[in-house]
């Protein structure tokens, strides 16, 4: 994606302003919401893990405005299927009115995606729920 979650401005425009030394001349605009990202990793990461497991459920992100799936350790296999190809496989991100809502939605979206050795932490943003 060329735009940042929570930003109303294209990341390319920000990068060009940085390169041109004109970051102070642009109006950085952000949405009034929160975002939480939960990484789906390969079990065993970072020490030892298997690759090549087919990833299913990615189509569930289509048409969902507040949900994002960022690919990291993925690739297409010979059959054209998306498979795992690294330790940090996907970044499942959701936005909400506040951090509690964003966290709830991000963890909800992690259940949409499946692959054989899927692993994730369950404590991302946990302090938010305890506050």
Feature map (PLM): residue ranges:
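Single conserved hydrophobic/aromatic residue that forms the stacking wall/gate
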Residues: 1-6, 10-11
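Peripheral (often C-terminal) accessory segments that flank ATP-dependent C-N-forming ligase machineries
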Residues: 17-131
């Amino acid at each position: 994606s060329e735009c940042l979650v929570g930003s109303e401005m294209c990341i390319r425009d920000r990068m060009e302003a940085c390169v041109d030394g004109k970051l102070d001349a642009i109006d950085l605009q952000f949405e009034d919401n929160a975002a939480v990202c939960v990484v789906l990793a390969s079990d065993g990461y970072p020490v030892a893990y298997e690759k090549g497991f087919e990833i299913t459920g990615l189509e569930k992100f289509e048409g969902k405005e507040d949900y994002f799936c960022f690919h990291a350790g993925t690739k297409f296999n010979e059959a054209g299927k998306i498979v795992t190809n690294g330790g940090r496989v996907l970044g499942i991100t959701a936005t909400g009115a506040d951090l509690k809502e964003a966290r709830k939605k991000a963890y909800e979206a992690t259940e949409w995606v499946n692959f054989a050795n899927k692993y994730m932490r369950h404590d991302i943003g946990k302090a938010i729920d305890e506050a």
